[in-house]
Amino acid sequence: MSTAIEDPRAAARDDWARAATGQPDLALARASADAGFRSYWRATVPGQGSVVVMDSPPALEDVRPWLRMHDLLERGGVRVPRVLARDTDAGFLLLEDLGADTLLHVIDAGNADAHFDAAIDQLLRIQAIPAPDDLPHYDEALLGRELRLFDEWFLGRHLGVQPGCGDLEALDLAYRVLIDAALAQPRVLVHRDYMPRNLMPVDGGLAVLDFQDAVAGPVAYDPTSLFKDAFLSWPPERVEGWLLRYHARALDAGIPVPAAPERFLRDARLIGIQRHLKVLGIFARLHHRDGKPKYIADAPRFLAYLDDALPLHPELAPLAGVIERHVRPALATATAAAG
């Protein structure tokens, strides 16, 4: 039995790509998949070079939010992949091929300053674009739902920890601090996953990927995501230097960051703590619900970020206590069992 018969989606993808390129014999090869339901397929078009097909099954992941944000960013001067053909009903896009290596693959201690300057270039362009009135807001409800991913998926499902009433109260108090701090920040267009794996070196600069979940939210969110990455870590002193570099350039560009660098660094730490807790929950959910175990291996990185930030915020001592009482013992037990 042929692959096309076994997988109707594959047959539809092949047929669409061949029609879109005018190449009846076009062969697609998997390029990558992401943490959602989209997949990417590469092909070579004679006389034109390589192209990429984005496959976003409509019943699982609507392609329209991606396209809407793509077009908004492109109009604002942000470098994004060019869309060569689109079929929103079927969930297929034909994109320019930006290559196989994201910034995550090429950045290192020696070239990080130059690459992060290029990343700041694109981020300032994003933040200068007025957020559409109907764009979702990083509001109290969304911030709270994200924080509860830590309780449900990382503590409960992954570590098997069932916090008692006192622990839940401690988390509630800490979450209140984090939510209030986020809501007090100036609001801009927020990518929500602005980090090296979603940036592509191209044309002497960087192109931006994976922007479909953008919201209107805290100005410190994206720079914090950039320098406190999910997949690689930098010395704290370099992170602070890059945050201050971003802050100075943002002030010059008219982005509504606080004038005082110390206040901006505080905002970055607090929104970073919120993000680290959320990501721990998301990585655990990807592992246990979605069968994608590779992400949870980076959990220690986020605990290290929390170790750096929490001592600077005594108002978050209840959260630090929960981590000491429950997270570290559970991880130690799991590590011993695995060894």
Residue locations for each model-derived region?
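Conserved NTP-binding catalytic cores of kinases and kinase-like/nucleotidyltransferase enzymes
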Residues: 1-92, 188, 202-207, 323-339
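Active-site catalytic-loop/activation-segment of kinase and kinase-like phosphoryl-transfer enzymes
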Residues: 4-8, 138-178, 241, 245, ...
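ATP-binding pocket architecture of kinase catalytic cores
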Residues: 32, 38-143, 148-149, 154-160, ...
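ATP/Mg2+ or Mg2+-diphosphate-binding catalytic cores
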Residues: 279-339
